[in-house]
């Protein structure tokens, strides 16, 4: 159960909106490798998010305790991760904080993607095209094409986003080196690549 004290949110409308967005996203998804939302409870002092229990703990701790994963186990877990992330992207959702600590294991050692605090939504039917994606680092191009314009509904075109978030060790370069627009799906794919490297025994989690 995830408990959020209302006094920790205060009167910050952005923080409160993020919490309700996370809950709304969890209500929309159903996949064997994504955490299930059982219930949301609100009181005057707290907001409670009751989630599926994953008895296997964090994948990060599992790798530390076992030092490495065998090829078949790593392949199976990564396939489950890709399946879950692919499902999210088809639903118009990006996670933006994929990391070993946000991947839990159930009692059968299956991946459970959790922590949607940085997740956001986009229009999966609005494809940007290669020219736009290749020129996102150019402020003149972005301004000329009005890509930084927020459309009705609070989104930009396609999966364009600007908020820098996530965890540095897993973050895509465009999140680290600039404050320009980025494509949310590619940020998730980069994080999946970092996770794959962590699962492969020859590298090890500490790299």
What kind of region is each of these model predictions?
Residues 3-29:
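Conserved N-lobe beta3->alphaC-helix segment of eukaryotic protein kinase catalytic domains
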Residues 40:
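Activation-segment/catalytic-loop signature of the eukaryotic protein kinase fold
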Residues 44-58, 62:
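Conserved short submotifs of the Hanks-type protein kinase catalytic core
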Residues 77-78:
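Activation segment signature within eukaryotic-like protein kinase domains
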Residues 81-93:
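Protein kinase catalytic-loop region centered on the HRD/HxD motif
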Residues 156-157, 175-186:
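Conserved end of the kinase activation segment
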């Amino acid at each position: 159960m995830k408990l959020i004290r209302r006094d920790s949110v205060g009167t910050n409308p952005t923080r409160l909106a993020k919490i309700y967005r996370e809950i709304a996203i969890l209500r929309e998804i159903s996949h064997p490798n994504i955490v299930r939302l059982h219930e949301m409870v609100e009181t005057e002092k707290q907001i409670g998010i009751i989630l599926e229990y994953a008895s296997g703990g964090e994948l990060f701790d599992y790798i530390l305790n076992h030092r490495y994963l065998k090829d078949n186990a790593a392949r199976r877990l990564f396939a489950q991760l890709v399946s879950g992330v692919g499902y999210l992207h088809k639903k118009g959702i990006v996670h933006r904080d994929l990391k070993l600590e946000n991947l839990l294991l159930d009692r059968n050692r299956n991946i459970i993607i959790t922590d949607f605090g940085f997740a956001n939504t986009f229009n999966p039917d609005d494809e940007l095209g290669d020219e736009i994606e290749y020129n996102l680092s150019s402020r003149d191009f972005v301004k000329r094409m009005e890509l930084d314009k927020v459309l009705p509904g609070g989104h930009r075109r396609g999966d364009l986003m600007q908020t820098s978030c996530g965890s540095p060790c897993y973050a895509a370069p465009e999140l680290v080196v600039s404050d320009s627009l980025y494509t949310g799906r590619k940020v998730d794919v980069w994080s999946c690549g970092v996770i794959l490297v962590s699962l492969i025994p020859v590298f090890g989690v500490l790299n």
